[in-house]
């Protein structure tokens, strides 16, 4: 199996490349840490599976989901596996919705990683493990993050150029989707789902 690995942390990338090759199931693993190098390599060589991180802030202005979309626009048949430490339901759903073949946590053992890659190669995925989540819109995410930071609602409405009544409607929609009834519950649920990072 030939793998293209894109991760912005060199130590992790180089170490994983070495371990994958040592697994004997992977015949070739090409590691890149910059977006330009990734797309050049992707176009020039053929790979069975592409391993892609979500957080690529040290290597690209885009995140892994955006890179995933670019990959599939170039070659819709590409098998892309998201390999990330962000093991949250909302990220898993987004990954599969955008066409990822699998979503794997970086904390898994090498044995499990290889087995999951074998499954991907055989066109098998883990869709049945993805919970049914009603995804928030981009505007709802902005509002959720603002209220969780403690921003005054009047200020939030002004910044978004909407009335306070419209803002309250958005907030109620957010609560309904998250199945919560107040800001504290919304904050805890948002962290669990991956919409926001903990404040501490």
Language-model segment annotations:
Residues 1-126:
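N-terminal regulatory/sensing modules of transcriptional regulators
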Residues 13, 72, 139-140, 171, ...:
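Short, cationic motifs built from Arg/Lys/His that form the positively charged side of catalytic pockets
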Residues 117, 147, 190:
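Hydrophobic "lid"/C-terminal helical patch
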Residues 122-126, 180, 195:
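Hydrophobic patch in the ABC ATPase nucleotide-binding domain
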Residues 130-166, 200:
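Helix-turn-helix DNA-binding segment
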Residues 152-192:
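Recognition helix of helix-turn-helix DNA-binding domains
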Residues 190-200:
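Intrinsically disordered, low-complexity basic tails/linkers immediately adjacent to helix-turn-helix/homeobox/MYB/SANT
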């Amino acid at each position: 199996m030939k793998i293209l690995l894109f991760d912005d942390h060199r130590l992790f990338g180089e170490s994983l490349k070495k371990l994958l090759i040592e697994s004997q199931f992977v015949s070739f693993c090409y590691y890149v840490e910059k977006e330009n190098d990734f797309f050049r390599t992707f176009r020039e060589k053929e790979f069975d599976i592409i391993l892609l991180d979500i957080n690529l802030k040290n290597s690209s202005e885009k995140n892994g989901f955006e890179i995933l979309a670019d990959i599939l626009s170039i070659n819709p048949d590409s098998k892309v596996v998201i390999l990330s430490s962000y093991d949250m339901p909302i990220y898993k759903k987004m990954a599969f919705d955008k066409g990822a073949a699998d979503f794997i946590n970086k904390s898994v053992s090498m044995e499990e990683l290889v087995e999951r890659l074998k499954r991907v190669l055989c066109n098998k995925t883990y869709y049945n493990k993805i919970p049914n989540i009603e995804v928030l819109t981009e505007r709802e995410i902005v509002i959720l993050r603002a209220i969780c930071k403690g921003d005054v609602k009047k200020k939030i409405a002004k910044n978004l150029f909407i009335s306070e009544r419209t803002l309250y409607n958005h907030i109620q929609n957010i609560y309904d989707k998250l199945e919560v009834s107040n800001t504290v519950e919304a904050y805890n649920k948002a962290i669990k789902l991956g919409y926001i990072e903990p404040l501490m």
